[in-house]
């Protein structure tokens, strides 16, 4: 159903290039493979992007497959909470460090850490635009978000 929605939305998504699926311990940007069979207990991150009228979109979400351990469920829940807490910090004249610290603090408070080399990014006419959004910079630092960027 998702592929049909993308095709019918008027986008010109090249799904092999714009869909990444990372299973279990893989951090990000995995590729679908007929050799990787998901089973009950696995967790998976699905990252889907489309292009509409020349503009890119990018969305990522973690899912539980079947019955997962409490450890894996907690990871999925905390990852979602980190995203939500980070988004609450996106406001005019706020700093990217405000977003980063909200994410990093919540991850660490729950026994996790963020991957230093992976972060957010700008998006628009190009898939990966500036700024790179590090999740390890401090509140009050980094690029200032202008009113029409938020």
Place the predicted regions along the sequence by residue.
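Active-site neighborhoods and metal-handling regions in enzymes and metal-associated proteins
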Residues: 1-150
